[in-house]
Design a protein with these regions (language model features):
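Hydrophobic alpha-helical segments and helix pairs
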Residues: 131, 136-139, 143-153
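Helical "lid/coupling" subdomains associated with nucleotide-phosphate turnover
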Residues: 4, 18, 42-67, 86-87, ...
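Short flexible coil/turn linkers enriched for glycine and charged/polar residues
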Residues: 10-13, 70-73, 99, 136-138, ...
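Short, surface-exposed charged micro-motifs
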Residues: 6, 132, 454-456
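A short acidic Gly-Thr/Ser loop motif
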Residues: 8-13, 133-139, 205-208, 289-291
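A short amphipathic beta-strand at an alpha->beta junction
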Residues: 492-501
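N-terminal glycine/serine-rich phosphate-binding loop of ATP-dependent small-molecule kinases
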Residues: 1-5, 9-15, 19-80, 94-104
């Protein structure tokens, strides 16, 4: 395992991300430090950073370097977004990084920013036809991603910082200023003719996306903190826009979920996105926590590691490796669960949309052992629920966690009331149906040596008969699997028969 540091200089902040990389190329963030700093706002009339601000930037970078050294980081990547080019004396910062830390600062072009945002997203989500929106301090980046490829892209010359201060929207918000700002945004959007196409969803990334998700989750009393792949509807964006525009700076600072350093720019952030969602024919909005930084990390991994290409498998096997789980057992339980799922389709009537849930729950069912074997099913529940697992939306993540937690032969109860805003009765039915199959599969590999080589299932009106092929004695496995018979009867209304062929 190695550690890598990532320093990111943007128009609104400096940020350090520390990540651990497993041998299989799986990374996980282990520390993150953000220093709010509206660099583009603090330029003086000659586009130079004032001495006080320059000293603060350099001292912050020294702190970042110290943190990297203390954590044993072996490699540091330093990048700056294109807004860095607005600083005419930026060579002072570049020279300081080189002289003090022996770091070469890479200043990205707009095209590179678009590409790395795209890479961060397609490595974490299945994107068929979406508009990707990033609102920075000085620009708005638009990317049309279709069938996993960049179809079109545009960079608009305004962001939340320059619009906020150009139109005096940092404190009290006057109606005339709102009208002028919205007119300016709308006119620029009309010049992007490819926005007239249809999109299945809009994916919002960056700090603006994270803050909108945090505000909306507080407003809805959302039951868990993970905001990657968080979903909203366009009318909810309009509600947030109308709520924020009625508040001055002091009142905005009290909005639950909003980071304090964005209180002055949150209105123009919403104004930009409000205009985009009005123009684009898509009701569905997703928030992605993966964007430019992750895109650069993925490129680094692809160049230096043999990375798993399936993005769901990348997450699942990465978690298995990092938690030192028994991967052979996980694979065997998944194989048997999948065989049972396919054989019992005439009974459960679940389609292939549940396959990602089945894979996640069966592969990660024992991940809680990394905390403690006792009650490990409960540990598995919250590990899965709080993990960033590619592809899965929040309902799928919750269902996967609940199914994994039900793999043992006990009376574990899913905390339904807490998550009633996410899952419904049909989801609960599917959880029980898949949970019953996982219980059987867990029992059929109780010896942890993949004894069962093949599973053959026959159905009738009263029974489900499972015939097992194996060169080994299966008495223990059959006994353990049959501990699920009462639950199976309750869920499938059939008696469970298991025997060796």
């Amino acid at each position: 395992m190695v550690k890598i540091g990532f320093i990111h200089i943007s128009s609104s902040s400096l940020r350090l991300v520390l990540a651990e990389i497993e041998e299989i190329g799986y990374f996980r963030v282990v520390d993150e430090l953000k220093t709010p700093m509206k660099i583009c706002y603090n330029l003086n009339n000659t586009c130079k950073v004032c001495n006080e601000k320059l000293h603060y930037i350099i001292s912050t970078l020294k702190t970042y370097e110290s943190l990297c050294l203390a954590s044993g980081t072996s490699n540091i990547i330093a990048i700056a977004t294109n807004s860095f080019n607005q600083i005419c004396d930026n060579e002072i910062i570049v020279k300081s990084l080189k002289d003090n830390f022996d770091l070469d600062l890479r200043i990205l072009t707009p095209k590179e920013e678009i590409y790395y945002n795209y890479l961060g997203i397609v490595k974490s989500l299945n994107v068929e036809n979406s508009l990707v929106v990033e609102i920075t301090g000085t620009s708005t980046n638009l990317t049309w991603v279709k069938d996993g490829n960049i179809e079109e892209w545009s960079v608009l010359p305004f962001g939340n910082i320059n619009l906020t201060y150009n139109y005096g929207l940092n404190d009290r918000i006057l109606s005339d200023s709102i009208d002028e700002c919205n007119s300016f945004i709308s006119n620029h959007l009309k010049d992007v003719d490819w926005l007239n196409n249809s999109f299945e969803s809009i994916i919002l990334i960056g700090d603006v996306g994270r803050n909108i998700a945090k505000i909306d989750k507080k407003r809805r009393r959302y039951p868990f903190d993970n905001f990657n792949n968080y979903e909203l509807l366009d009318n909810e964006i309009h509600e947030l826009y109308n709520m924020v525009k009625s508040k001055d700076l002091r009142q905005r600072r009290k909005i639950e979920g909003l980071e304090q350093d964005m209180a002055d720019t949150i209105f123009t952030s919403l104004a930009i996105f409000h205009n985009i969602s009005d123009l684009v024919s898509s009701r569905y909005i997703k928030i992605s926590n993966h964007s430019l930084r992750e895109g650069i990390l993925y490129e680094f991994l692809d160049n230096n590691y043999d990375v798993i290409h399936d993005i769901l498998d990348y997450s699942l096997y990465g978690i298995l490796h990092s938690l030192n789980c028994n991967i052979d057992h996980a694979n065997q339980v998944y194989k048997i669960t999948l065989d049972l799922f396919n054989a019992l389709k005439p009974l459960h009537h679940l389609d292939d949309n549940y396959l990602n849930i089945l894979k996640t729950s069966s592969l990660l069912h024992d991940c809680g052992i990394s905390i403690n074997y006792l009650q490990h099913h409960k540990h598995s529940f919250y590990i899965i629920l709080n993990s960033y697992i590619n592809v899965l939306n929040h309902k799928e993540l919750l269902m996967s966690a609940a199914i994994a937690a039900s793999h043992r032969f006990n009376n574990y109860q899913i905390p339904v009331p807490q998550f009633s805003s996410i899952i419904n009765k049909l989801d609960l039915k599917a959880i029980y149906e898949l949970g019953a199959l996982l219980k059987i599969a867990e029992g059929l590999d109780r010896s942890l040596v993949s004894s069962v080589k093949d599973v053959e299932v026959t159905l009738n009106d009263e029974e489900v008969i499972i015939l097992l092929s194996s060169p080994l004695n299966l008495d223990v496995e059959i006994h353990q699997a049959l501990r699920a018979r009462d639950f199976f009867r309750e869920v499938y209304d059939r008696d469970l028969i298991i025997r060796k062929k």
